[in-house]
Amino acid sequence: MSAAEVIRTVDVAVVGAGSMGSMALWHLAKSTGLSVLGIEQYGPAHGHAAFAGESRLFRAANKEGALYTAAALEARALWTELERETGRQLLLKTGVLAVAPEGHPFLESTQRSIVEGDLPHRFLDAAELRREYPQFTVEDGDIGIMDVLGGGLRSELAVATAQRAAIRRGAEILYNTPVLGIDEGDSGVVISTSEGIVHAQKVIVTTGAWTTRIVPELRDLVSAIAIPLTWFMPEDISQFTPDRFPCWMRDLDGDHAFGVPTLDGYSVKIAPTTRIDTIEDPDTDPRELSRAELRSCTAIATRMFPGILPEVVRSSIHPESTTADHVPILDVSESGRIVIGAGFSGNGFKFSPAYGRVLAQLAESGSSALQHPLFTLGHHRRRAQARADDLVLADDYPVLQGH
């Protein structure tokens, strides 16, 4: 096959069929009359992207702020819709328990999100935490906030499920097909792939850590990071089953970690994310944690959970894209032909059905009610210029680590 051969001509192409791309495909496939094509450099649900690693948190009450509440509630409804459509259980409704010293910034921002969004919740003092959740190390002065609408998401299963739902509705996905470049022309977008040329009227780019390889003009706005995940073996796994142990976040002695109950029956995810490194090349940068990093994760995990064995039984590293303020980009180019979804900063998967809808609507009509002004390219470019000029914008948003 000639590299210049046109292999597909479609209305909308989605480059990257992972967290956001799979959901954009699902929403687009529900629109009548559109021909929709996904282009994915790997297979259906793989271990190379930000969504991999078994599970992610779903939080309605976000420590990143009430900016995200509308998207969270929309996403929760859409997770339920996808579950009904496919018969798959994707959201584990365990709640999400945040534990930290009273007055910790993450707790205060979570509480503000609860108040502003009127979200269901529980507050627990140290005595209640020790009684109800003895798995945790609880210090005097610790408090807990239970996000009642929160839970855990089966991330690889969710991506594969959204892909299959889109295909059943008429979308096509080209797997194992790297995209080499995108060029705008007078009559649409030309997408060069390893298998040939795709012509599309619109293209949605959701390529995570590979974003700037596909859209190099975003290099001043988007960079790549590596998110580490670790699992440990409890001495008593029955204490960590979903009926007894919620999804959680913990801040202790300056360290932050998150995790979910056991899903495999022998291990539990306890993932310290105090340190997240930037990377230059998601294809070649380190794909596993060093022994020193594993020891550091073990020290943090055993301080937080005394009932686990002091050894990582499984670990992985996942490339992700980020922005300077950790606020995502969900916007369309000046031409209206290229839609960008990038910079989710480890805080995107929970919102992916809602963000996928935003991206689909931007491709279809150029606008979306869920596109917050801070998600625009204009905002991010103003912030980049302000940083260069050492200025503070009136709409600056506090940088809080997400997952």
Residue map of PLM features:
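Beta1/beta-strand and adjacent pyrophosphate-binding region of the FAD-binding site
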Residues: 5-20
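Active-site substrate-recognition segment that forms the wall
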Residues: 26-30, 89-91, 197, 202, ...
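Dinucleotide-binding Rossmann-like beta1-alpha1 core, especially the glycine-rich loop
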Residues: 55-132
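C-terminal catalytic lobe of FAD-dependent flavoproteins
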Residues: 299-403
